[in-house]
Amino acid sequence: MCVECNVCRRVCPFGAIDGAEKTEGMVQCHSCSIQCKVPVGSTGACKRYTNEGGRLVRNRALVVEGKPQTEIDPRIAKPVITAVGAGTNYPCIRPAPHIVCEKRDGVDVITTVTEAPLSYSGVLVKLDTNTYIGEEGDTVYCEGKPVGLVHTEEYGSKMIYVGGANRLTAKDGGFATARTIVALANGEKVELTVKTADHETGKPKMIKIVCQQGVAPIINGTQETTMRIGCGSATIGLLADVMKECVDECIVIDHHVTGLFSEHLAGKEVGMTWSGVVPNATKSTVGRYFGGHGDGIGGTVLQTPRDAIKSVDMSIAHAGMTVLVTNTTGEVGALFEVQADGDVKEIPMSEKAQRVVDAIKSNCQGSNTSVMYCGGTGGSARGGVCHHPIAITEAVHAGKAHLTIGGAPAYVYPGGGINFIVDTAKVVNHAFTWVPTPATVAPVEYTMTKEDYEKIGGHMNHIKNVEDFPEYQKH
C-alpha cells in the first residue's frame, strides 16, 4: 500500500505518479520528516511502524541487552614497553627485536615489539569544518605529487585519505606519499592541494589546505575556527524554542541540509506555521532543503545572506516580518524585514536575533584536525611474534592478544587480517618513519599473557624481563 513517502514521485523521470487515495483509518506518522500516511495493516516507508486498528505501533519489541562483546583483560590492555625505538629484525622470520615480560596481578604478561614496515598504510585526516574542500574522490596532492583523495564526508567534518598500498607503489608519487603520511602522523604541518572543478565554469581549480594534528586547518589562506552545531535542520531542532522568541522566520544555511524554521516540524512543535518565505535551495522534506556545494556560506553556493531568500509568498507573509539568516556555526548573521512588495531589506541585527546567533555559537566546538593512521600488520611482521602466523591473527580477534601502536590502543577491523586504525594524538611523539620500498614504519606491540603466548607458538627462548632494560630502570 502507498504511504505517500514520495520516493516514486521523486525518481519518476516523467512526473506521472499521483498521490494515493486516502483510506479510512489512515494514520500520519511523525517519527521523521517524511510523515508517511499509513493505511490500516500497513507499515511506513521505514518498516518500523505498523498501523494496527488506527494506531501506529513500533513493530519490534524494545531490546534491552546487546550482543555479547569481547572484552580485553585489563592486565593486557597496556604494553609492557612500546615499540618506539625498538628497531626491526628483518627478514621477519627472526624473532621480534624485544619480547618482554612483566608480572601483573600475579600473572606473567608478554609484549612483543617491532617497528614494522607496512606497505598497506595511510592516514585518514579529519578536518572539523564546513568549508568546501572539493568533491569526494578528488585527487589530493603534496608538493605536486598525487598522494590521496577527498574521502567520504562525516557529520561536521571533511575527510581526506592520504596513502594506501596503491598510492605507495605508484610510479608517480609513491615516495612523496610515504613522506606525507609520516609527516601527518608525526604531527607535522603539511600543505595539501585538492584538484577539483569550479562549480560555475567547470574549469579545474586548486584548493590549498594546511593541516596539522591538533590544529585547526587553514583552507585557502583562511584559518578555520568553528565546527558546526549540526546541519541546518538539526540547528532548528535544537534551538526552535529560542528562535520562536526572537524572530518571525529563520533560515539556517548549510551545504548538506539548509533549514527553514517556520516550516520545520520543530517549528510546528513550538506553534509555528509556514511564513511564506522560500529558501534558495532544493526542497527535501518539510523545513529541510538541500544546499549546493560551493565556496560560499556554510560550504554552499550562497555568497551573501540575502542569497538565501529565494522569494516570499505575500499571500501568507506580511510586511514587517523579520527573517534571520544565519549558518550552522553562527559566524554569519543578518536580519531582514519583509517589504510590502515581497522583497526583503536588510536591517540592523536586533538583540533578540543576536540571541539566536549566539545560541548557535555557544553550542559549537572549535575546529580541529585529527590524523588517524591506518595500517595492516597481517603480513610477514607476524613472524617476529610467533611460529604460527595465523595464531596471532586469531588471538587478536579473540581478544587474547591486544594490539597497540606506539602505546595507543588501535581499533582492529572485523573480518580477516589485522587491519587497524589508531588516533595518532595518542601515540608516542614522532613514532613513525618510512623506508624507500616505499612503506611507512609503525611501532607495533602485541600484548598477551605468557600462557597465551606459548599457546600461539611464541618465541619463548627470546623472552626478557622488563627490569633488565636500562630504559625501564630510568623510568
What are these regions (language model features)?
Residues 21-26, 45-55, 61-67:
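Short cysteine/histidine-rich metal-coordination sites, predominantly Zn2+-binding motifs
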Residues 81-244, 248:
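Long, contiguous alpha-helical scaffold regions
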Residues 38, 54-56, 120-121:
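Short active-site-adjacent helix-start/loop capping segments
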Residues 27, 46, 109-113:
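Generic recognition of long tandem-repeat/solenoid scaffolds
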Residues 23-25, 40-42, 101-107:
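Short, ordered beta-strand-loop transition motifs
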Residues 30-40, 182-475:
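Auxiliary Fe-S-binding modules of radical SAM enzymes
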Residues 1, 7-22, 31-50:
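Iron-sulfur cluster-binding cysteine motifs and their immediate structural context
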Residues 33-36, 57-83:
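Short Fe-S-cluster ligation motifs
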